[in-house]
Amino acid sequence: MMDVIYILWLRQLKRYLRSKSRIIGSLGQPVLFLFALGFGFGPIFQKAGQGNYIQFLTPGIIAMSILFTSIFSGIEIIWDRQFGFLKETLVAPVPRWQIMVGRTLGGATVATFQGLIVFVISLIAGFKPQNPAMLIFAFLIMILTAILFTALGTAIASILTDMQGFQLIMNFLIMPLFFLSGALFPLNGLPKILSILISLDPLSYGVDGLRGSLTGLSHYNLTVDFTVLIIISVILTGLGSYLFSKIQI
């Protein structure tokens, strides 16, 4: 079992590391957000008495990078289906859920790596973790967030057959998930309806967990963040495994 999962995990990782253009291209938007918003809105944020905006913004940008990378990893399923690799994989004498788990862990590893790169860039931009001892918790939050959204991307890709449809659905999902996560603004004092929508957004708990572990500022608390992320990750991984097992070849 572990051989199948490991091989597919390693394949995802090798594809990522061999594509330097993909690595550089996927960093463009997070870096733009970090520097343009961080330094552009920084003075306004400070005048409002909210402190250093780079400190506040960085966890949200790390989460954004993980979200984009992990959820779009599902497109590789459609790509492999069109070029015949998926068929060869699915006819192998192994349970399909193992194939799905291997691909999901591979996509999550890539997304976590992207998040770590953005974290390093944020240090150059002036971000300072409040407590280095809490970095391990931030890393765990990154992993859980990556697994959650990779599983979501895989589940959606399992029921679609064309890249255009997948990209349209992902774009429809990604922007609300990101903007309702509290990545760009504090969650205190918001209208009730907006607070409800934010609490229903799973990315909110990834952002809050990163912000809590990196800066000590948490709207919920780390226990709630970890619990919600674990539960939703398990549910989406199970759903993704089921939908992946129903793919027709």
Q: Where are the predicted features?
A:
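Pore- or pathway-lining transmembrane helices of multi-pass membrane proteins that form conduits
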Residues: I24-L32, T161-S181
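Short, hydrophobic transmembrane alpha-helix segments
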Residues: F39-Q50
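Membrane-interfacial helix-loop-helix junctions in multi-pass membrane proteins
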Residues: R15, Q46-A48, K128, F178-I235
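Alpha-helical transmembrane segments and their short interhelical loops
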Residues: R96, M100-M170, L217-S241
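Short cytosolic juxtamembrane segments of multi-pass membrane proteins
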Residues: Y242-I249
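Residues that define the loop-to-transmembrane-helix transition and helix capping
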Residues: K20-S21, Q55, W97, Q164, ...
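Aromatic- and glycine-rich beta-strand/loop motifs that create alpha-glucan
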Residues: M1-Q29
